[in-house]
Every structure is written in structure tokens, then in C-alpha cells.
Amino acid sequence: MDEYQDMERFSMDNDYEGGRWEGDEFVYQKRKEKRKQTKNDATYGIFAESDSDSDDSGGGGSRRKRRKDRDSGRKADLTKPVNFVSTGTVMPNQEIDKDSREHNDEKDRDKIEDNDMIDEDVEVRGGLGIGSSGLGLGFNANGFDDEDNLLPGALGKKIADRAKMRGKAKVEKRGQEGGGAKGGKKNTLGSDIGQFEKSTKGIGMKLLEKMGYKGGGLGKNQQGIVAPIEAQLRPKNMGMGYNDFKEAKLPDLKKVEEKKIIGVSVSENEQSHGDRGGKNLWKKKKVRKAVYVTAEELLEKKQEAGFGGGQTIIDMRGPQVRVVTNLENLDAEEKAKEADVPMPELQHNLRLIVDLVEHEIQKIDRDLRNERESALSLQQEKEMLINEEEKQKRHLENMEYIADEISRIELENTSGNLTLDSLAIRFEDLQTSYPDDYKLCSLSTIACSLALPLFIRMFQGWDPLSDAVHGLKAISSWRKLLEVEEDHNIWVVSTPYSQLVSEVVLPAVRIAGINTWEPRDPEPMLRFLETWETLLPSSVLQTILDTVVLPKLSTAVEYWDPRRELVAIHVWVHPWLPILGQKLEFLYQIIQMKLSNVLDAWHPSDSSAYTILSPWKTVFDTTSWEQLMRRYIVPKLQLALQEFQVNPANQNLERFDWVMKWASAVPIHLMADMMERFFFPKWLDVLYHWLRAKPRFEEIQGWYYGWKELFPQELTANERIRIQLKRGLDMLMEAVEGVEVSQPRAKANERTQSVPAQAQAQAKAQMDSTEVLSLKEVLEVFAQEQELLFKPKPNRMHNGLQIYGFGNVSVIIDSVNQKLLAQKDGGWFLVTPDDLLRMHNNTTVSAKR
């Protein structure tokens, strides 16, 4: 029965306090007079504050007053909900909520205190006739009325006996726990309540395991719950259906097991420290020590994590838009709601304050670093300005010295004592001592202005064609003083050196080139240009070539006559090819026209034509050279081969040598075609008849190899020539073997039949091209016959067609439509070659008038 000793029994033991029985009626000893109803009672009803406790008298009133005083002195726990006193006996096997258990414990302690106060009150009051016990009439030692006389019958006696037994048990218990009724401290409940369950719980599981239970829910399909339903504390003043409150749900089995393990460890810890914990329950709980983070630690932590990129983040997930400065606590509110953290609004506000403080610390640190960087940059700028100031001071001192030196040079120039050597030495000293100031102040221009009169005096009357080295050393020494080193191209006209050469050297070269230089003798001018190659600026060199050399060459070519000239034209034109290059292309048309006029009357026996034409093979373009050979040289060589006779007995090789001399000049395909058509048929026919006459093979073999050596290397390397020579060798081998020698014409016909159709078409097209002339070629031939100049006009086009000059008339050749157009009165009209000749003659007569 010890387990029910702290619980209140539901009985009638305390129903007859404060009165007595008289007969069959219960009479109160101190009956209060009924209090009159006041205005507040009428207004507030049961909600009015009552002062009936102050009006109570007697033992009951004094007990309620003392109880009220004690209750007023005890601080109420406002965080706990309203609890109701149970009217029945609570069985120990029922689960008791933590808050209700604490409330019942407090109630039991209050009852014990009330009984103590009653005993103390009884002992203090003095009565009559009992002495030191202080008991009055009608009261026993326990402060109650004499219930033996008041309670009637067996029922009353039984109730009184039970009350005495309970009172006696309470007194004994207080004596054991507190050491007496007076001055003893009330003991708290033991900390080992429920420890016995450790040895009793789990027996059911053991029995089930012995019967084959392996865990899981009960039932056929294991649909039963495994973990017990946990009771959840409903918030204070919350009704049953308020705000969709969620009732208890099945907890996770893993969490339940973890919770059981934690509960056992805690209970064991409490048991091991039971004595010390029981004594220290009255002490204040230990407060968690606050951890402070300094600004340096915060900045160091942020620096390790990395500061944000300065991006503004706007959170629009909730009902209100907010700006987020820290992503760490972005979901803190949702997590707090899920974890049921108390006072989430307060924690949110504190978190905002902490974030703002962190942001402010970071801003202050950022401003501090910016200020430090600004101070550092200002310090560097200060040092730079100091250095610039010193540099400017030195520059000013240098400028003063340079100005004084220039003044002294001016005085010497005015007095006439200044020479090129002394002037060069002074400016060389200035350039060496003050290189930056020399460039900045453009002292090269001042030096050029002072040296120019002296150079003009030196080169006065100079002939560059006869004395190319005159003044070369002086110009070379002044080039370094006058050129601009910053510019990659130091030979521009704007440099002082280019100006000096243009005003000193160029006039002398122009005068000598125009007046005394003969283009047919290019050596003097070439020698001068080679000597001054490294000293002449590019602008001056181009001026000499364009204004002196090229006009003189053009005039000489126009007046050149191959019939009267003793010196070949390539002798005095080709040396200018590396220097002039493409600028000579317009002269090639004139040279071709003049050569064509001479080649009309040329005979293959005249070797001078080869001497004049062969050097131009690499100069003219391939098409122009082939047309020239096809039109003027190849026909004459074909006639020479037709007249050539192959006679082993008395062979004359004069005409054959005429043809072989042109083997390196005439294109190889034209030469091979000419030999196949006009030489090898005769040669093979003579060999065939000779082999039929049964000659000596040694003579024929010597004759064959003798002819083979007469062919130049250009022909023997050609496949077509080798085939013809092999045919003769095959005929010779047939005769040696005693086989009948086949006729060369039959083999030629057989070879012609074996040639593919495509090759025959190409050969036919080539033969046709040799016979048919284009409209341009016809006009060229007509201009040569009339001794008129026919050449294209550079950079002049009309409707995408090149404009040519036929004498004094502009002509367009439309090769597609085979039309010839001439310009007349601002328009283009169809004309014939005779019309062009008439128009040229008319323009010539008009010009003479």
C-alpha cells in the first residue's frame, strides 16, 4: 500500500470537520453569519473578488487564511496550463503527464504543510485544565473534536478510527523524514521513482520471442502498430477542435528505440547521482555560458567562407517581398516551425539583428580596407609626384643648358666660323648627354636647319654619275643625328634626314640624269644607286626612279629600232628589272610590237634574232611568249625542216642546226610537234630503205647514235621525241634479228589508231588554235603592219572590258560577241580595223593643225 500513500482517497473522512453531531443533526461550532450582497456582487456575480477569507473565524478560518498567505508567497508558474484536481484514485499503470504529475506532487506537499501548520497551531494555543498540552475543552491531542461522542453508530466509529490511523501514520512519516514536527524540512519526492520498471519491463517481449515472435506489427499481415502512441501536450487554453490541431500519430520505430536508450541512460545517471541531486534540487539551474564572437573572428570566418559577390537577393516566396543579405539563415523560419521552436518570432527578430550587425561589421571592414588602399594609392601618387617634380627640375636644368649651347652655336654661325664637323660634334655631345631631351625638343630639326646651308655649299656643282662617293662620309655621319628612332620607318619624308637628302642630293641627281645620262649606258646611274643604297631614304629613291630613270627608259624604248641598233635592247633594259620590277610592264608591249615588225622579214639563217629574243623568254609572260613564237618563229623553222634532206651519203646539217638552235627558246610542245611532222618521217623512211638494202649494221648503228647526239637535251627529255627515236631503234633490231622490217608509215597509222579519242580531240583543238587567230590578235597584226602602237591602258575599264590604245584611238574588244568598239564623241560605236586607221589619221591631222 506504500505506492498509494501520496494519493488522496475518495472517501467521507474529511466531510465532518468544523462541527459536531447532536442527536441526528450536525451542528457547526462556529457558524458564519451570512454576508450581505454588495453592488460588486450584483455586477460581477461569480467573477467578483471575495474577501470572505478575512471574515472567517475559528479554526477553519485561520487555516484558510494561513493557506492563502502561503499561496500568495509562492510564485506561480505562468508557463503551465490550467490543471484540474482529479477526484478519483489514479492507478500506477496509467500514463501520467509530466505537468499533471508535478501538480499532484505540489498538492501533496501543500497538504502536508497544512497538517504541520495545524499541529503547530494546536500546540501554541493554551487551553483550560490540561496544562502544558494546551488542549481546551472538547478537543483531543490532534486538534480535532471528540468524534467518539459526536459520530453515531458503528459507521461513525469506523470512520473515526480510520481517520485516527491516517493521522498517526502521517505523524510517524513526518518524524522519520523531517526529524520531528517542529522546524523540520519537508523532503522532496525520491529521484528513483519508476526505477523498478527497469527490471519488470521487457518480460512480455521475452515471452513473445520464445513463442517465435520476431518483431513487427501484430496480425496476419503485420498491420498492427509497433511503437506506442505518444501523448502530445496540447497548448494552453486550446480547445479540442482549435486551429486543426494534429493529434498524436504513430512515431518512427527508430526514434522510439533511440528515445528508450536515451531514457535509460538518463535514469541511470540520475540514480548514480541521486543523493547529490536530491540535495541540490533547491538550487538554481546552471545557466549556459554565453559565447561571444569578436569582430576579428567574424571577419576571419567570413573571409575563409568567402564574402558574397555583392549581389542583391530578393526572397519572394512569402506573402511579403524581402531582401536577403545572408543565405545561411534563409530557411530558418521554416525549420523553426517544423521543429516547434518556442517563440519563433523573437528568434527571427534576433536573427535579423545579428545579420544586420554582421553586415554592418563587414561594411565597416570593407570601408576600412578601402581607406587603407586609398591611403596607399595616395602615398604612391605622392612619391610619383615627387619623382616627377625631380624629373621636371632636371629637365628644366637640361633645357637651360641646351638653350645656352644653341645660342653659342648661333653665334658661331653668324660669325661664319661654323663647320659641319664642329656642328656634328656638338650635337653628338647633346644627343649622348641628354637623349630624352634631344628627342623631346626635336634638336634634330634644329641641327638640320643649321647644317643644310653647309651641305648645299658642299654639294654645289656635284656630278653623281661621275663621282658617286662625293660627300658620302659626311651624309653617313649626320644620319644618326637627324633620323627619328621612335619610328620604325626612319626613311619617311617628314624626318629631318629625308629633308636634308631631298634638298641636297636629289637636285644633283635629277640634273645629271636628265641632262647627261644615256639609258643605253645604265652603268653610271646603277653605280650611283648601288653606292647610295643604304643612305637614300625610300621616298628619295622612288622619286629618282619615277622622275629620272623610268621616263628616260620609256623614251629610249620608243626610239629603239632593232634594224639599226647594234646593242641588244635587253642589255640596257634587263639591269633595271630588280629595281623597277612591274613598272617596266608597259614597256614590254612596245618591245613586242617592235620585235614583231622585225620578225616578219626574218630568215632562220639569221642568228641575231635568237640573240635578241631568247633573253626575253623569262621576262614576258608565258602566253605572250608562246604567241610570239607560234606566229613568227615556228612557221619559219617548219619551212627550214621541209627543205632539209636526210642523206647518209652526203649529209648537210645546216638547216637542222638552224632549228636546233631554237630548241631552248621555242616551247617544247611546239618543238616536238614540228619534229614529228617535218623531220622524223623523212628520217625513218631513209632508215627503212637503208635496212632493206642489207647494209653493214655497224655503219647504221653509228649513223643512228650520231643523229641522237645532235638533239639537244630539251628534246631528248621529251616523251614524244624518245618514242620516235625508239621506233628507229626497233627497225634496226628487226633487221639484226632477220625479221622483215615494217614500213614506218604503217606503224605511224597504227599508232594514230591506238591514240584515244580524247587525245586526238586535244591535238585537233591545238592544230585549230594554231590556225585561227582571235580578234585581238588580228588587231595586233593590223597595228604592226601600219606601224602603230597597240597596248592596254592601265587601270581603265568599261563594262568590265579592258580599254586598249590603237594609236590615238581608244578601243574595246568584245571577244564573246566578236565586236570591236571605238570611243568617239563620248560614246562607243562598232568599227572595223580600217575605220580605226581612218580615225587615227584624222586625230593626227587635227593635232598638227
Curated annotation (Swiss-Prot):
Disruption phenotype: Long circadian-period phenotype under free-running conditions. SMART domains: G_patch. InterPro entries: G_patch_dom (IPR000467), GCFC_dom (IPR022783), STIP/TFIP11_N (IPR022159), TFP11 (IPR024933), TFP11/STIP/Ntr1 (IPR045211). Residues 1-118, 167-193 are annotated as: Disordered. Disulfide bonds: none annotated. It is found in: Nucleus. Residues 354-401 form a coiled coil. Residues 1-30, 69-78, 95-114, 167-176 have a biased composition (Basic and acidic residues). GO terms for biological process: mRNA splicing, via spliceosome; regulation of circadian rhythm; spliceosomal complex disassembly. One of its GO terms (cellular component) is spliceosomal complex. Keywords: Coiled coil, DNA-binding, mRNA processing, mRNA splicing, Nucleus, Spliceosome. One of its GO terms (molecular function) is U1 snRNP binding. It comes from the Eukaryota. A motif (Nuclear localization signal) lies at residues 60-75, 156-186. Its main location: nucleus. Residues 200-245 form the G-patch domain. Involved in pre-mRNA splicing, specifically in spliceosome disassembly during late-stage splicing events. Involved in snRNPs recycling. Required for efficient splicing of genes that act within the plant circadian clock. Part of a transcription elongation checkpoint at alternative exons. Required for correct expression and splicing of DOG1, a regulator of seed dormancy. May induce transient transcriptional pausing of polymerase II at slices sites. Physically located at the target splice sites. Identified in the spliceosome C complex. Interacts with ILP1. Belongs to the TFP11/STIP family. This is Septin and tuftelin-interacting protein 1 homolog 1.
